[in-house]
C-alpha cells in the first residue's frame, strides 16, 4: 500500500536548495550502516564498554566537523539545522557577560538572508525565553547594549558568500557573540568560519550522503570554542583511559546535560541524530579530504559554467561570490512563469523569488547532462540558441579572500579506507566492538 501511494508522487529533479540537496549515498554506507540493524537499532551509548564502535564512529563525525569548520570542539550532532540555530541562541544567552546580564541584554541580531525555516524555529524558541530577534541587513548592523549575539548564514539564502570578517570584529568589539549557519560542503572551498572569528558554527550534514527522504531527518552539526564547552548542547564524545591505562571513548562532560542537571540545564537537548551522524562521519572517512574537495569543486565548476552560459542568454546573476547557488534577474521579455512552465515540462523544480527572480542550487548528483537541461530551460525562455556540452572544465570563481587555504580531515582515519572493501571491513570492525 505504501509503495502504491509512493508511486503516485511525481519524481522531479529539485534545485531549490535552501539547505536541502540531492546527494549520493555511497553503497557501502547504505548497505552496511543505514540498512544494518547493528547500527540502526542501537540506543544511546551509556555503557561505554559495549559501545566503542559507535563511539569511534561518532568521534569521526566530530573530528570531520571540527576540521571543516576550523573550530576546536564539536558535539556528536543535533536534530536539524533550524533547532541547532535555536540552541545556538539559547547558548549565547546563557554565556552573556555579567554586564549584559545586569543590563538584561535580550536582543539577537539575525541577518535577513538566513534560511526561512531556520528563522521560524529560532522565533518559536526565542519568544518564551524573552529573547527578541532583530532581523536586518548585516552591513547596516550597529551594536547596542541590548544586543548580545548575532546569527549569520554562510553562504546566505541567496547563495552569496559574504566576507563577514569585519562584521565579526565589530560584533566582538561590542561584546557580541557570533553564530554562523554554514554549508558544510562549501567549507571544502570557502574560508571556514572558525578562521574569521565565529564563536559557534552550526548547520546540517544532510549533503554528506544523507538522502532527502520526505524532507528529513538529517544530522545537524554544532561546533564552538573550547571555553564554552560546559554550555554546549547535545552530547560530546571524548577520550578517556580504562583501569588498565588503555585509551577508549566515552561520553564527555555529561554533568552539563539536561538529563542530569535538569532545572539548572542551559539546554533541553538530550538527544541526537546518531545514525545519520554516523553515516556522515563514514562519508567523510570514505571520501577523505581529496574526495570531498573533488565533489565540492565539481559542484562549483558546474555552477560557474551555468552562470557564464546564462549571462550570454541575457540573464543577470546577482551573487558576487558563490559556491553552488545562483540567482538571476530576468531579461524584460522573460517572465518567471515562462521559465516555470518550461521547467515543469522537463520535470524540474527551480527556486522562484517573490520579486520575479529565478534561482537554482547545484548538488553532488548534477552532471553534464543535467547542466545541459538547466541551460536549455533558460535559453528557450529567452529565445536564444544554446550549445550542449560534453564536458565542463574545472573552474573557480571564488575570491582569494574567501578561498580556503588550510588542510582538513588530516587524521589518518580519513586517508585509510577509500575502497568499498576497506570501508566495509572498517565498518564491520567497529560494529563488532558493540
Regions found by a protein language model. Name each.
Residues 1-60, 66, 260-261, 400-434:
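N-terminal entrance/gating region of PLP-dependent enzymes' catalytic architecture
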Residues 342, 351-377:
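Noncatalytic alpha-helical scaffolds and linker/capping helices
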Residues 64-85, 104, 108:
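A conserved hydrophobic secondary-structure block that centers on an alpha-helix together
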Residues 313-342, 362-366:
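Conserved PLP-binding catalytic core of the aspartate aminotransferase-like
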Residues 36-48, 66-71, 102-105, 133, ...:
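Gly-rich Lys/Arg/Thr-decorated short loops/hinges at beta-loop-alpha junctions or inter-strand turns
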Residues 208-309, 313, 318-320:
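Active-site C-terminal subdomain of aminotransferase-like
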Residues 140, 247-249, 385-406:
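Long, charged amphipathic helices and adjacent flexible linkers at domain junctions
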Residues 83-248, 310, 327-328, 341, ...:
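Conserved PLP-enzyme active-site core in the AAT-like
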Amino acid at each position: 500500500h505504501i509503495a502504491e501511494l509512493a508511486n503516485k508522487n511525481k519524481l522531479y529533479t529539485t534545485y531549490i536548495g535552501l539547505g536541502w540537496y540531492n546527494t549520493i549515498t555511497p553503497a557501502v554506507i547504505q548497505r552496511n550502516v543505514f540498512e544494518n540493524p547493528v547500527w540502526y537499532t542501537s540506543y544511546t551509548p551509556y555503557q561505554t564498554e559495549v559501545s566503542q564502535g559507535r563511539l569511534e564512529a561518532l568521534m569521526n563525525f566530530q573530528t570531520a566537523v571540527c576540521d571543516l569548520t576550523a573550530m576546536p570542539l564539536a558535539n556528536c550532532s543535533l536534530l536539524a539545522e533550524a533547532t541547532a540555530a535555536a540552541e545556538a541562541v539559547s547558548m549565547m544567552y546563557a554565556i552573556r557577560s555579567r554586564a549584559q546580564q545586569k543590563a538584561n541584554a535580550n536582543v539577537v541580531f539575525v541577518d535577513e538572508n538566513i534560511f526561512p525555516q531556520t528563522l521560524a524555529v529560532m522565533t518559536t524558541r526565542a519568544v518564551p525565553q524573552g529573547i527578541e530577534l532583530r532581523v536586518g541587513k548585516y552591513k547596516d548592523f550597529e551594536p547596542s547594549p541590548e544586543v548580545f549575539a548575532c546569527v549569520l548564514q554562510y553562504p546566505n539564502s541567496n547563495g552569496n558568500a559574504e566576507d563577514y570578517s569585519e562584521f565579526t570584529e565589530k560584533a566582538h568589539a561590542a561584546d557580541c557573540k557570533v553564530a554562523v549557519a554554514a554549508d558544510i560542503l562549501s567549507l571544502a572551498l570557502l574560508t571556514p568560519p572558525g578562521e574569521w572569528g565565529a564563536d559557534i558554527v552550526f548547520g546540517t550534514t544532510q549533503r554528506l550522503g544523507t538522502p532527502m527522504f520526505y524532507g528529513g531527518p538529517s544530522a545537524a552539526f554544532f561546533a564552538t570554542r573550547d571555553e564554552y564547552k560546559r554550555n554546549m548542547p547535545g552530547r560530546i564524545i571524548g577520550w578517556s583511559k580504562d583501569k588498565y591505562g588503555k585509551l577508549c571513548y566515552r561520553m564527555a562532560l555529561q554533568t552539563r546535560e539536561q538529563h542530569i542537571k535538569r532545572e539548572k540545564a542551559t539546554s533541553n537537548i538530550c538527544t541526537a541524530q546518531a545514525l545519520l551522524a554516523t553515516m556522515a562521519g563514514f562519508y567523510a572517512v570514505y571520501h577523505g579530504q581529496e574526495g570531498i574537495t573533488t565533489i565540492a569543486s565539481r559542484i562549483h565548476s558546474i555552477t560557474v559554467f551555468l552562470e557564464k552560459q546564462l549571462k550570454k542568454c541575457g540573464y543577470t546573476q546577482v551573487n558576487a561570490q558563490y559556491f553552488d547557488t545562483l540567482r538571476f534577474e530576468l531579461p524584460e521579455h522573460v517572465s518567471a512563469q515562462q521559465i516555470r512552465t518550461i521547467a515543469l515540462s522537463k520535470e524540474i523544480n527551480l527556486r522562484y523569488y517573490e520579486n520575479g527572480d529565478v534561482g537554482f542550487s547545484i548538488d553532488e548528483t548534477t552532471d553534464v547532462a543535467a547542466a545541459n537541461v538547466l541551460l536549455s530551460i533558460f535559453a528557450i525562455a529567452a529565445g536564444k540558441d544554446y550549445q550542449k556540452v560534453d564536458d565542463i572544465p574545472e573552474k573557480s570563481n571564488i575570491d582569494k579572500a574567501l578561498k580556503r587555504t588550510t588542510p582538513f580531515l588530516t587524521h589518518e582515519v580519513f586517508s585509510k579506507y577509500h575502497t568499498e572493501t576497506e570501508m566495509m571491513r572498517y565498518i564491520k570492525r567497529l560494529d563488532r566492538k558493540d
